[in-house]
């Protein structure tokens, strides 16, 4: 068995709590509930995609999207929405569902112009204060692989409700050092899987938000 394919969310889940990760992703004896916030986020992403891709008007419910999406729409370049990318274990591009896929990610929006690109990830969180740019980093590095002509990426986490953007610039020549960090993170998951050791990592989320009822740190115990 392989822990691959992995993604940013998979890494974050493991780092948050290996035991919970095991039950959700390996044993699969528990599932996270599909919350109203998740459904809202999915709908917002679809509205954004339809606007950028097809020019479909934004519903009144999502009127706050008009400003940021119009700004993105005005940018010159080839606009690609909800792009599914895969990489094999040699970091060569492959299909999202290919048998040899090692890493997977979906970019909300990529705008390509000559040797530069913008990589955008939409967020519906009400605050950008604790933004994690790891997802941006992985999307940028995968974009370099899938579009080898690109040398520089301006990336951003776009908090559409808060009207804030967390920005970062990535250059192709720096990709190697960035990948090393993610190889290390992935190796920790590999070791846990090989040794079948999935220790709980207690936090303030355990008692009210964890679905793994059998864990001693769960609030039901």
Predicted features along the sequence, with ranges:
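RecB-family 4Fe-4S metal-dependent nuclease core
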Residues: 1-221
């Amino acid at each position: 068995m392989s822990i691959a394919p992995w993604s940013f969310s998979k890494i974050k889940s493991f780092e948050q709590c290996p035991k919970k990760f095991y039950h959700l992703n390996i044993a699969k004896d528990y599932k996270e509930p599909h919350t109203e916030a998740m459904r809202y986020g999915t709908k917002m992403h679809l509205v954004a995609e339809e606007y950028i891709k097809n020019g479909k008007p934004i519903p009144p419910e999502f009127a706050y999207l008009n400003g940021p999406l119009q700004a993105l729409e005005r940018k010159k370049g080839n606009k690609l929405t909800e792009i599914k990318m895969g990489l094999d274990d040699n970091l060569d591009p492959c299909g999202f569902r290919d048998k040899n896929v090692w890493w997977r990610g979906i970019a909300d929006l990529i705008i390509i112009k000559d040797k530069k690109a913008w990589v955008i990830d939409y967020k519906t969180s009400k605050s950008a204060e604790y933004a994690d740019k790891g997802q941006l980093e992985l999307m940028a590095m995968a974009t370099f692989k899938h579009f080898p002509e690109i040398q520089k990426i301006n990336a951003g986490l776009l908090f559409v409700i808060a009207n804030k953007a967390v920005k970062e610039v990535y250059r192709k020549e720096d990709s190697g050092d960035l990948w090393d960090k993610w190889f290390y993170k992935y190796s920790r998951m590999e070791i846990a899987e090989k040794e079948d050791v999935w220790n709980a990592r207690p936090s303030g989320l355990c008692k009210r938000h964890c679905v793994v009822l059998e864990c001693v740190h769960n609030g039901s115990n």
